[in-house]
Amino acid sequence: MGFLVFHVFQVLKIRRFLEQMKETDIVKAIMKYLRTVPGCFCWKEHGGMYGTAGIPDIIACIDGRFFGFEVKTDIGKPTKLQEATIRKILAAGGTALVVRSVDEVRTAITDSLH
């Protein structure tokens, strides 16, 4: 029984690692795209012990408009804190959402600025 629990834990750990790798790739692709957008200032928010919990992964200001992009894989879900932060950004007049691709970011920017 102990081995089975250990094995399941290892499988879940590996799955999370692979998901993180993919999320990292999505973040890199989005950052690469945002650097081509005229009038865009953006940065990757670093989590961990020195970051602020719940802040979207990517912050951008485009032509004076605030954007917060919480990046997730196809199976990833935002935490309750991330959802609350997105609601606060929206209430303050910014744009914030969960994105899973560069195309979703492109659409959000286009919809917001036009």
Q: What would you call each of these model-derived segments?
A:
Residues G2-H114:
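Catalytic phosphate/metal-binding cores of nucleic-acid and nucleotide-processing enzymes, i.e., regions
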